Design a protein with these regions (language model features):
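Non-cytosolic membrane-interface motifs at loop->transmembrane helix junctions
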Residues: 34-43, 98-110
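Membrane-water interface at the C-terminal end of transmembrane alpha helices
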Residues: 112-131
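Core segments of alpha-helical transmembrane spans in multipass integral membrane proteins
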Residues: 16-24, 42-63, 78-85
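Membrane-interfacial loop-to-transmembrane alpha-helix junctions, especially the N-terminal start
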Residues: 7-12, 68-76
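Hydrophobic alpha-helical membrane segments
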Residues: 51-54, 73-91, 111-118
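Membrane-helix boundary connector in multi-pass membrane proteins
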Residues: 86-107, 126-127
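Membrane-interface helix-boundary motifs at transmembrane edges
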Residues: 1-4, 63-72, 99-100, 130-131
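Cytosolic juxtamembrane helix and N-cap/initiation of the first transmembrane helix
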Residues: 1-17
Length: 131
């Protein structure tokens, strides 16, 4: 598998991840075993689902031709970096235990670490432009 094929696969994998996350948020489903229904807020989770849908569309568009769409790939990389940082910052901003969801801390850490691993893969597989 070439580096470009690997990048396309990783982009498609990201689209699947965000599609599953968007569906879970929109319908109030759980992916992790420690779902806390009190944290489900239809309005906010619908906004998260919309953001996931936008990410899915961008990932799929870039996966078709990452070299041609390198500028959009760069925007996606920045978006993944921001999402990963925000996942970690949530731990410090929100007292999940006081909301009755202490196990959400582990979920949030897991999501942040997965995001940073995904970010690393995108950076490693990035098709550098030759000027």
């Amino acid at each position: 598998m070439s580096k470009l094929e690997a990048l396309k696969f990783i982009l498609l994998l990201g689209a699947v991840y965000y599609a599953i996350g968007g569906i879970a948020h929109y319908f109030g489903l759980t992916i992790f075993p420690f779902f806390v229904s009190e944290l489900y807020v239809p309005y906010q989770d619908s906004i998260i689902a919309l953001v996931c849908l936008i990410f899915v569309l961008l990932l799929l568009a870039v996966a078709r031709d990452p070299i041609k769409n390198v500028d959009t790939l760069n925007v996606l990389i920045l978006g993944v970096a921001l999402a990963s940082v925000f996942s970690i910052l949530i731990i410090y901003k929100i007292d999940l235990a006081s909301l009755g969801a202490p196990a959400k801390k582990l979920q949030t850490i897991t999501e942040g670490i997965m995001g940073f691993i995904y970010l690393g893969l995108l950076l490693w597989l990035h098709p550098r432009r030759k000027i």
